[in-house]
A protein has these predicted regions:
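Alpha/beta-hydrolase fold nucleophile elbow
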Residues: 173-185
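Glycine-rich nucleophile elbow surrounding the catalytic serine of serine-hydrolase chemistry
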Residues: 183-195
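C-terminal subdomain of alpha/beta-hydrolase-fold enzymes, centered on the catalytic histidine
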Residues: 209-210, 216-226, 291-476
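N-terminal cap/lid subdomain of alpha/beta-hydrolase-fold enzymes
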Residues: 56-150
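Alpha/beta-hydrolase active-site loop
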Residues: 124, 134, 151-169
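A catalytic-pocket lid/entrance helix-loop region that shapes and gates access to the active site
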Residues: 105-106, 195, 199-289
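Bacterial N-terminal signal peptides
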Residues: 5-14
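N-terminal cap/lid segment of alpha/beta-hydrolase-fold proteins
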Residues: 25-71
Length: 477
């Protein structure tokens, strides 16, 4: 689950021996947006920080953009929401410019003219917003003679994010404000890691969006159990399995019941599974996920996401998206040194390892008056490939749900919102649900929502409408 696109926050202030000082001086501009049919005035502030090592040598920069509504009499009671995606190697651009932020950037590719408009579903009317890009993404960068490696691992990254949040709250006189933190994809790992050390924050809500919450199923039969319901809805959507008049939710739930019942029991038997039972399970799987029973048997009933998305529409010369199984594209040319997930048609990476957004760069320079000429990096696999994973876990993302349980036990009013998409095979919907179900959380303060979307759960106009409704309720409860 390493290549999970999304968004990030960071600033290494809390890490021992790490100091931060301004690079580009903070820039504040004043704006008005129409949100929910009302005019909302707000200040936008871009801030870049230099991260230094224990000896004081500058290593890299972290940058963030804050949107603060003006005209508020008592800011101590107004919520502030910090949002980040993941990757690792993803900027905050998806949540910033496609979901929560006051402006939408609707064209992303290099060479395209900016297409920017107000976001009528922005959260700026109900909460102040802070979007931060980690080292190597957005306008953030590794400095000459420095290194991003201290911030390109689970622990260093989380310390950097938590340090940024503390510094921002203190600098802006908001330590008493209700704090909400939203992490998407690997951002869920980041959020779960850092809340274990966030007792000093006035945390009100944790928002996990298509989160990678750890390695509960990684390398085990649980991987296949988690993926099967998402494969079932993908097969129906792609015309390879029948819905029988059922809703997406009903298709998912029927497949979930089978996956966690007969299917899981069959996998547990391993090579001791009788042939007759194997064939019965394979036939049921075939009806659910649209692959031939023979193919399923050849894989010992264990069909992973990559096998599924390549096989589902192979007769048409198409591969199905990983981040969004509703998206298809012609089978790409085989590149032995390139991860299959990098060729995901729902990712839009093309032959490069980097997505540059000219539109976002132009917005930052022209509207927010940011005096930076370098490109805005929306996503870079170069950071992803350099990420250091805990070797004690075989190079996998750690399981961090105990941190969430600890935080919720320490803060009796802290609530959690989990949002996922039915069409997400990068983080199948069942995986984070299972992780939270087994974290011994106070479930009366936990809400789990499934949307008819892919990995970017709030993408598109309908996604933003659903997002605004969910977030308005969650933040104001």
């Amino acid at each position: 689950m390493r290549l999970l696109i999304a968004i990030a926050l960071a600033l290494a202030v809390a890490a021992p021996g790490v100091a931060a000082r301004p690079a580009t001086a903070p820039v504040t501009t004043h704006h008005r947006a129409i949100v929910g049919g009302r005019a909302i005035d707000y200040d936008a502030t871009f801030d870049e920080q230099v991260l230094s090592d224990a000896a004081g040598k500058p290593q890299a920069t972290i940058s963030g953009t804050a949107y603060v509504r003006t005209g508020i009499v008592d800011r101590s009671k107004r919520a502030v929401t910090f949002a980040f995606n993941g990757g690792p190697g993803a900027s905050s651009s998806p949540l910033h410019f496609s979901a929560f932020g006051p402006r939408l950037v609707e064209r992303w590719g290099s060479g395209e003219a900016p297409s920017i408009r107000d976001n009528p579903q922005s959260l700026i009317d109900i909460t102040d917003l802070v979007f931060i890009d980690p080292v190597g993404t957005g306008f953030s960068r590794v400095l000459k003679g420095g290194s991003g490696q201290p911030y390109w691992d689970v622990d260093g990254d989380a310390k950097a994010v938590l340090g940024f949040i503390r510094a921002w709250l203190k600098r802006n006189g908001r330590t008493g404000s209700p704090v909400y933190i939203a992490g998407e994809s690997y951002g869920g790992t980041r959020l779960a890691e850092m809340v274990g050390d966030a007792d000093d924050l006035n945390l009100a809500g944790l928002i996990f969006i298509s989160p990678a919450l750890g390695n509960e199923g990684e390398g085990s039969d649980l991987d296949y159990v988690f993926a099967l319901p998402s494969m079932a809805v993908a097969a129906v959507r792609n015309g390879k399995a029948g819905a029988g008049g059922r809703s997406v939710d009903a298709v998912f739930e029927d497949a979930r019941s089978f996956a966690m019942g007969d299917y899981a029991l069959a996998l547990m038997k391993g090579s001791l599974l009788p042939d007759a039972e194997r064939d019965r399970i394979a036939a049921r799987m075939s009806a659910l996920i649209g692959l031939p029973a023979r193919t399923i048997v050849e894989h010992h009933l264990r069909v992973d996401a990559e096998t599924f998305r390549k096989a589902l529409r192979s007769s048409e010369g198409l591969v199905v998206g990983r981040l969004d199984t509703r998206v298809t594209a012609p089978v790409p040319k085989h590149e032995p040194n390139r991860p299959s997930a990098a060729n995901d048609p729902a990712l839009g990476l093309g032959a490069s390892n980097v997505i540059i957004s000219d539109a976002i760069g132009a917005y930052m320079r022209n509207e927010l008056k940011v005096p930076i000429d370098r490109p805005y990096v929306s996503l870079t696999l170069d950071v992803n490939f350099k990420w250091t994973w805990p070797q004690s876990r075989g190079g996998a993302a750690p399981s961090l749900t105990a941190n969430i349980a600890k935080a919720m036990a320490a803060k009796p009013r802290l609530r959690l919102l989990l949002v996922g998409g039915y069409y997400d095979l990068a983080v199948p919907l069942l995986a984070p649900r299972y992780a939270l179900d087994h974290a011994w959380l106070p479930m009366d303060r936990v809400e789990m929502i499934a949307l008819e979307t892919g990995h970017s759960a709030f993408e598109g106009e309908q996604g933003r409408l659903e997002m605004k409704s969910l977030m308005r309720t969650f933040i104001k409860e």
